[in-house]
Regions:
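A general structural signal for well-ordered alpha-helical segments in protein cores
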Residues: 20-21, 89, 93, 119
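C-terminal helix-rich "cap/oligomerization" subdomain common to oxidoreductases
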Residues: 99-136
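Interdomain hinge/lid region at the active-site interface
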Residues: 64-104
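Residue-level detector of conserved, well-ordered beta-strand and adjacent loop positions
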Residues: 59, 73, 136
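Rossmann-like dinucleotide-binding domain that binds NAD(P)(H)
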Residues: 2-67, 110-117
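NAD(P)-dependent dehydrogenase/reductase Rossmann-like domain
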Residues: 49, 80-83, 134-136
């Protein structure tokens, strides 16, 4: 079972953090409780605490050439780092077209709302670094 996640991703924080959050929410698989912004405008970073006490650390690189990278750690402190180098946006567009063709929803509404709620809390937290902001 996943105990902690260290996540890195490219792009501007407010716009692109959602892509890291999608994977983090899937990996942690429990509701997020609160967030703390620990970075600067130039070097965004944050901590997410989940309802079961587990945490995730994330950083956002303001560099679109950077790739997504996730280090997943289990309770025995074994870690595995996964770097995602796929053509993410092409795959996204393919899935979007498939959705319009079939109407099949690949991600639940609840998961989408969870991701957006964490993103909103992170944006609020970025105004007051090093203070916890509850997920609403």
């Amino acid at each position: 079972a996943v105990d902690s996640v260290y996540s890195e991703g490219p792009g501007e924080f407010e716009m692109y953090i959602i892509h890291q959050l999608e994977m983090i929410v899937r990996l942690m698989n429990v509701p997020a409780k609160r967030v703390m912004y620990t970075g600067t405008k130039v070097h965004p970073s944050a901590v997410i605490e989940f309802s079961d006490g587990r945490i995730c650390h994330l950083i956002q690189r303001n560099d679109k050439n950077w790739s997504f990278k996730y280090t997943v750690i289990n309770k025995e402190n074994n870690a595995e780092t996964i770097e995602i180098k796929s053509d993410y946006f092409k795959l996204f567009i393919d899935s979007l077209i498939e959705f319009f063709r079939t109407g099949e929803i690949k991600v639940s509404h609840d998961r989408t709302i969870t991701v957006i709620s964490i993103r909103e809390a992170l944006i609020k937290a970025s105004i007051k670094p090093f203070e916890w902001v509850e997920i609403e």
